[in-house]
Amino acid sequence: MSTLPPTPAVPPLVQTVWWLTRPINLMESCRRRVGDQFSVRFLGFERPMVMLSDPEAIRALYMEHSHGLPPGRTLTLMPILGPRSVLLLEGSEHLARRRLMLPAFHGERMRSYEGIVRDAAERQIASWPLEQPLALHPYMQALTLDVILRAVFGVSDAERGRRLREQLPRLLGLSASAGLQLRVLLSRRLRQGDPLERLREVTLEIDRLLLGEIAERRAEGRFEEREDILSLLMGARFEDDGQMSDRELRDQLLTLLLAGHETTATALAWTFDLLLRHPATLARLTAEVDEGSQDEYLRAVIAESLRLRPVVPLAGRRLATELRTGEWTLPAGTDVTPAIWLTHTRADLYPEPYSFRPERFLEGAPTTYGWIPFGGGIRRCLGASFAEFEMRVVLQTVLRERELEAVGSRPERMARRNVTLSPQHGTRVRVKRRVARPAPAAQPLVA
């Protein structure tokens, strides 16, 4: 008798293509036919993966810290981020690096980035063509990349910064291809060829740039005199008084660089798409921004956008011990993940779950494991607070300076790009200049 929930009645190849091309449709279909818990089988993986959406089951999964990472994360991310990335380490190694990196994204240090984010947003907005259709997502990517380079990496060499701005989008474009991901899975199964050859070439160029920055910083010393995260990490020490090597610093830098700008850019693109499809919500938010006295509705808009358009669909674990979830007892070694979209669209948690209604977050806070756009437990996204903070600053700046209108009548469909769900057509908008309004005298955004 199987100890795992049922799986769709189609071969693993079909499930794999289905997941790579229409992930939301796959999850919704399984929920309708099977229920809250189901298994899926993907090419290249020996075992099925169990997806679940009940907050109590998610709490039980995330509260057990001994569970490991599912192999899918390593397969997808290690060729890009490197083996020492905090996203890929486990156990004490993961916790030690998390402790070193977390202070950079909280408290006074994070608030000090507000001017940098606002300046980057204003410069980016000034470059937008007026009165013609454009895809907003690439502009959001350029904006958030500028922020992460200036505020987090503190690249001091202008030429190096320019080349990183060229190479990182290339790396993202190559890694986002569903066709590439399918070839990776098939190559594991057939043991033929290296589908990542082009991606490795771009990664080597980025390595050269990052390692060059690290070498110069190490030669200069005086890490305590700078406020960027690279200097913070280079000066930090583990409990045994050891430090990160140059190669490990490279892995952490690339992790922060990619995870810290692509996900936020995508979340911003989704938020604008939703706002432009809901004029009353946009009008209320714009009025709040103009008044400048509070940001409660802005926070609610962001929370609702992240609920209805979660950027990362999965945040799983490999069980170290058995897990009891409802009628199923899942054995150790099972790969289990919350299906974040399914959790966020449960009618018992969110009445009218497919409606964009930010007011629900003014009526009360979501349950801890019923709103998980950043994952949960000891692997919750390090930069979650920074991402929400950056989104607030960017949304305020755009709404003060420009008017946007949607191009086309249909909302964007979700398309899978590596580990993210992005607007299929990049959030098509038309931009108009807004009557100049000075930024209101308000208290700084609370991080």
Language-model-detected regions and their locations in the chain:
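N-terminal membrane-proximal hinge/A-helix region immediately C-terminal to the signal-anchor transmembrane segment
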Residues: 1-96, 111, 115-123, 158-159, ...
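Conserved cytochrome P450 K-helix E-x-x-R motif and the immediately C-terminal K′/meander segment
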Residues: 14-38, 208, 292-326, 347
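Cytochrome P450 proximal C-terminal region
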Residues: 31-32, 121, 169-170, 290-293, ...
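Cytochrome P450 heme-thiolate monooxygenase catalytic core
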Residues: 1-7, 69-78, 93, 109-266
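Cytochrome P450 catalytic-core helices
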Residues: 263-288, 385-400
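Cytochrome P450 fold signature focused on the C-terminal beta-domain
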Residues: 221-227, 284-296, 308-328, 343, ...
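Conserved cytochrome P450 K-helix/beta-meander segment immediately N-terminal to the heme-binding cysteine loop
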Residues: 338-364
